[in-house]
Regions:
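Short cysteine-rich clusters marking metal-coordination/redox-active sites
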Residues: 15-18, 35-38, 80
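Cys/His-rich microdomains that often coordinate metals
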Residues: 19-22, 42, 84
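Short linker/helix segments within small regulatory modules
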Residues: 24-34
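A short beta-strand-turn-helix
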Residues: 50-68
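Thiol-based oxidoreductase modules, predominantly thioredoxin-like and allied folds used
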Residues: 51-52, 84-110
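Short pre-active-site segment immediately N-terminal to redox-active cysteine/selenocysteine motifs
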Residues: 65-66, 72-76, 119
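Conserved redox-active cysteine motifs that mediate thiol-disulfide chemistry
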Residues: 72-86
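Non-catalytic, surface beta->alpha helical segment in thiol-disulfide oxidoreductase systems
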Residues: 119, 124-152
Length: 152
């Protein structure tokens, strides 16, 4: 899915200019980062971040300087497959203002239980680790953007 690898300290992103892997700390998301090697500006994440552990989920949602939209999904879910390209559009269009992440509920059922996700897809918006809104069901990209924008 991604050339971005999240861990508990931040996002590992390869520089598009020289290939050097750089760490973008969650606390600094939304500001400008420069490559440690070539000093060129690094792009903001423009694709959904695939979260693979509770620890990384907690680090991203609690420390991100930007709001984090999390898509809870499953591989067997038809509506989840339909909304996946819409999530990619939102991530690309919202780069620098919103972090978009995905949680496969089959791989991380503990997170689905913890956040009482009973229908999928479910999108949950977090600000500084606090759930501020949620929406169940598939939506096109404009509907997702409207959902995010409706939260103060």
């Amino acid at each position: 899915m991604s050339n971005i690898e999240p861990d508990e300290r931040g996002l590992l992103l390869a520089c598009p200019h020289c290939g050097k892997r750089n760490r973008l700390k969650y606390e600094g998301l939304g500001r400008t980062f420069r490559c440690a090697q070539c000093k060129n500006e690094l792009p903001s994440p423009r694709e959904p971040i695939d979260l693979k552990s509770d620890l990384v989920f907690d680090a991203l949602t609690s420390r991100s300087a930007l709001p984090v939209l999390v898509d809870f999904w499953a591989s067997w879910c038809g509506p989840c497959k339909m909304v996946a390209p819409e999530i990619v559009k939102v991530a690309s269009e919202s780069a620098g203002g919103l972090v978009v992440a995905k949680v496969n509920t089959e791989e991380l059922p503990s997170l689905a239980r913890r956040f009482r996700v009973t229908a999928i897809p479910t999108m949950v918006l977090f600000k500084r680790g606090i759930e501020v809104a949620r929406q169940a069901g598939a939506m096109p990209a404009p509907g997702i953007r409207k959902f995010v924008a409706s939260v103060p």
